[in-house]
Amino acid sequence: MNKALIITPTGRPIYHHEDYDKDNHWRFTKPERTYETCVVVYNDFQPEPGTYDYIIRRKGLKWNLAPEVSKIINWQDYDYIGVWDDDYATDIKSVNLALSYARRYDFRLFQQATTSFQTYDCLKHNPEFAFTETNFIELGVPFFRNDIYRKVLRFLDAYKYEASDWGIDKVLCFYLQASAHVVHDCTVRHML
């Protein structure tokens, strides 16, 4: 098991940004990826060909969809599971690099550093570091180690998520009893 899975509720065309290779958007299904992508289409949108390995059609909020999708996709076969919003830009090389750090240093949960203007200081890209340890990651583009994802699913089964502003990200590390990491050698950008 050395492949990750990104589950991404999707309802719009992919976003590109000049900082990333537009021919290698993170959702493109190219052979050099060390991950697969499952798009969960929440409206009538038809995802671009070659931008997903699996497609599921379901309506709902991302954190309510994650447990449903996890009953359909065999997530246990993956070493890391990401649950990403569809409005982020990065590329395959960046995601692969972040996953290589996670695998080498056994991260429990992590994300790539952000270059977005609206972000928390601890998540902002800092080229002085390869990665940093923190007690917080924003839940727009998180990755969870397989055993940690199991705990996230238990949390989501016990809590009925009803709004995007609840602040799960502020308590998740405490609940999981795990530190988080921000990989600064690669970045991601929130486009909205």
Question: Model regions: which residues?
Answer:
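A structural signal for short, well-ordered beta-strand segments and their strand-loop junctions
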Residues: 83, 109-112, 180-184
